[in-house]
């Protein structure tokens, strides 16, 4: 009798050990570094970047968790938690993600945290749920390894607003073509030595020419939007200020015949102080939706929590079908072998 009891116990123990993880719970578990998991994670990042209207494009840094749920009658749903890092490419920049550099820790990096539910059915992928938020590295941590590195400051900082207005005025003064308006302050930093302010901002072409503008408020954005991304530095000296600005204009679709073509984007060196232009417009159109600009706010970065509308965060109202990204991201090594534990996966760049 005792032998029979022992035999039954061993049989139950063997069945528990041989069952795959997640069996009986309605899901299967994959390793976070499994090629299948990484494939779906890259689809999630591609979806995120396509829905960004402000701030900077994201790149996959780490896969934290993954579960694959069966969906009746067909298909399965991937439940993912991933970490991303900010790149130096703006959300409106058409540069392929593989050519975008990851913003380094010395530049005051920003990390994103995202949850995705992605349906796979008949070989196609559809995002059912997407929710993200992002957080900059703490100033204290940045100063630990780089005491003189520039630190993120608020968009509504007096020096930031002044630097953006001065830089945009300098750009328009040197540009003999289209007059550009401010769309977004994307990033701002204080530099301790030499004392200066670094800013990155987005501009858009209007139906005015630079030499004819008397009232910027009457200048309207073109029907075929053309955006540009600018980086500027304003050095604060006792004897005055020095501003330098460089803008990259993004390619646009053919414009109407009566639109003024934009000239080449000049780089302004050490320009004399320029009278700031009129304040920014009350609202501008960014991508498919209107985004109120108003006055710069107290944020230091554009949080990913604003990337998705309430509809998109639950399910794609348009039934958008997603396809695998054609180009892998930079710095990716080959697929990792079996790991223990299954998750979290490897860190591709750095943790903050």
Curated annotation (Swiss-Prot):
Cystatin fetuin-A-type domain: residues covered: 19-133, 144-250
Biological process per Gene Ontology, one example term: negative regulation of bone mineralization
Leader peptide range in chain numbering: 1-18
Modified-residue entries (Phosphoserine), positions: 134, 138, 309, 313, 316, 318
Gene from which this protein is expressed: Ahsg
Major place of residence: secreted
Pfam families in alphabetical order: Cystatin (PF00031)
Molecular functions (GO terms): cysteine-type endopeptidase inhibitor activity; endopeptidase inhibitor activity; kinase inhibitor activity; receptor signaling protein tyrosine kinase inhibitor activity
Matches recorded under Gene3D superfamilies: 3.10.450.10
Domain of life: Eukaryota
Name of this protein: Alpha-2-HS-glycoprotein
Family: Belongs to the fetuin family.
Disulfide bonds: 32-343, 89-100, 114-132, 146-149, 208-219, 230-247
């Amino acid at each position: 009798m005792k032998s029979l009891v022992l035999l039954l116990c061993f049989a139950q123990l063997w069945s528990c050990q041989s069952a795959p993880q997640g069996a009986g719970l309605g899901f299967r578990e994959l390793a976070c570094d499994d090629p299948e998991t990484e494939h779906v994670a890259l689809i999630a990042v591609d979806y995120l970047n396509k829905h960004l209207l402000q701030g900077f494009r994201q790149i996959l840094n780490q896969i934290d968790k993954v579960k694959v749920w069966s969906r009746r009658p067909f298909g399965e749903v991937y439940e993912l938690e991933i970490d991303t890092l900010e790149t130096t490419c703006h959300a409106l920049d058409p540069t392929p993600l593989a050519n975008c550099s990851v913003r380094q820790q010395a530049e005051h990096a920003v990390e994103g945290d995202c949850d995705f539910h992605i349906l796979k059915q008949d070989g196609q992928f559809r995002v059912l749920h997407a929710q993200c938020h992002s957080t900059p590295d703490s100033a204290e941590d940045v100063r630990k390894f780089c005491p003189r590195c520039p630190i993120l400051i608020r968009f509504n900082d007096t020096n930031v607003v002044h630097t953006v207005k001065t830089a945009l005025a300098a750009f328009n003064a040197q540009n003999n073509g289209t007059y550009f308006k401010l769309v977004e302050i994307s990033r701002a930093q204080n530099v301790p030595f030499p004392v200066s302010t670094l800013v990155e901002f987005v501009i858009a072409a209007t139906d005015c020419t630079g030499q004819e503008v008397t009232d910027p408020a009457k200048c309207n954005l073109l029907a075929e939007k053309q955006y540009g991304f600018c980086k500027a530095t304003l050095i604060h000296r006792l004897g005055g200020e020095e501003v330098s600005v460089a803008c990259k204009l993004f390619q646009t679709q053919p414009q109407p015949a009566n639109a003024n073509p934009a000239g080449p984007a000049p780089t302004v060196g050490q320009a004399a102080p320029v009278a700031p232009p009129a304040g920014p417009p009350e609202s501008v159109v960014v991508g498919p939706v209107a985004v109120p600009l108003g006055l710069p706010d107290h944020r230091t970065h554009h949080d990913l929590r604003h990337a998705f509308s309430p509809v998109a965060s639950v399910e794609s109202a348009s039934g958008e079908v997603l396809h695998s990204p054609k180009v892998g991201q930079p710095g990716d090594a080959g697929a990792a072998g079996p790991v223990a534990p299954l998750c979290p996966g490897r860190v591709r760049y750095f943790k903050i």
